[in-house]
Structures are given as structure tokens and as C-alpha cells.
Amino acid sequence: DEIGLYNTDFFGVEDYEYWLRIMTHFGDILSVDQTLYQYRRHSVSLSETRRKMVHQQLNRMRLQFIDLILDKLRDKPNELCGLYIEMKHTIALPSELIKKFEQIIPEIRGIECYRDEPAIIFGAGTLGIQTEKVLKEKVHFFVDNDKEKWGHLLANKGILSLDEMLRRRKSDQIIIAVGIDRVYEMMVQLWRLGVHKFSVAQEILWLYEK
């Protein structure tokens, strides 16, 4: 099988597009447990100087190969959820594509836009702190799975367990504030507790960056 050359239509993400064509033809790409190539990011690298263009190209490429990507990530819901959040932020996803994501990870139906109302931050870590700095007095308290954090203060706000949060919560929105690769597991945790609506910190921070 002939894969062909780099596709100049995908300038900025041509490596990714080439790998996906390889996977389309041969199924998988195996790894070699050696460092054969190092990729450096610096202030004048393409990834930094043309970030917006790279994101646009990346999403064009993802849309072209979306069925392959969904198939490969079907058993990796954390990665698939992160991909969904990134794509949803940068482009208007077609309704039929949203349904494809929902069929694999139905919990994403619970993601809603932050409503500029009182909130609870689920995740008393770096991203939680960043989110609190943006929302300030709108944040009532934090929630975390780490028992060692319960009862302590973060930004002068208490850190509670999930059980305590459920007892004290009124109509506050819950904001999941963890790395994008862990959002899905937090969503599942809330879903099982009967909380079916939540916001994602990444979307809030992206909004306030504008």
C-alpha cells in the first residue's frame, strides 16, 4: 500500500494527518521503546507562533478522520471526553457528530455552560485554584476526593467531601476542575451520585481568556 507524501492542505498538523493515514491503511502504529526523535517547543516554534491556525487545522483533520478516531478511542473514554471538550470549544460540532460521542460516553450530555451563578469547584488543585481566581466570590467551596484535604481551606474556602457537598449543596452549579484527561472519571462519579448537570473548568477559563 502506498501512503503518499505529506498533505500540504494540513500545514501545521501534517505529521498527525500522515499518522492517521498510516492507521487507516495498516490498522495500528507500534511503539519503539527508544528516544529516536525529540520535539522542542520554544517561543518561535510553529506550535507557539501560530497556535490558532494549528488548532483550526487540527480540528479540520479530526473531522476528516473522525470515524477512525472514535473507533480507536472507543475503549479510552478519558481521552475521548477530552477530545470532545477541545473540539466543542473551538468549532461548532454537527449534531450528528455530537450524537456519535454521546453514544460512546453518554455522560457528556451533562455538560452545561457556566451560568454566572454560585458554584462549587470539584477539584482542589491547580486548576481549581485558577478557576476560583476567575470566579472569586461566586465560589462557595471546594470538593475533592483526597481525604487529606477535607476540612482544610483553599483560597479561604472550605474543602469538603462529595457526601458533605451533597448535603450542603442547594442550586449551586458544580464545576469539574481537573486535567482534561481526568474530566470523564469525575463526570462518571457525579453521574452515579445523581448529579447529571455540571460545567467544565477548561471551558470557563477559555471563555475568560477572550
Q: Which stretches of residues belong to each language-model region?
A:
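Conserved nucleotide-sugar donor-binding
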Residues: D1-G4
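Short clusters of hydrophobic/aromatic residues that line enzyme substrate/ligand-binding pockets
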Residues: Y6, F10, L46-E48, I159
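A contiguous binding-surface segment within folded domains or other stable secondary-structure elements
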Residues: F11, H25, S31
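Acidic donor-binding loop at a coil-to-helix junction in glycosyltransferase catalytic cores
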Residues: F11-Y18
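Short, well-ordered beta-to-alpha junction loops that form the rim of enzyme active sites
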Residues: Y16, Q34-T35, G123-G125
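Short active-site alpha-helical segment characteristic of glycosyltransferases
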Residues: Y18-R21, D28
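Catalytic core of nucleotide-sugar-dependent glycosyltransferases
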Residues: G27, Q34-S43, E48-L73, L93-G110
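Hydrophobic, well-ordered beta-alpha structural blocks that scaffold small-molecule cofactor pockets
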Residues: L73, P77-K210
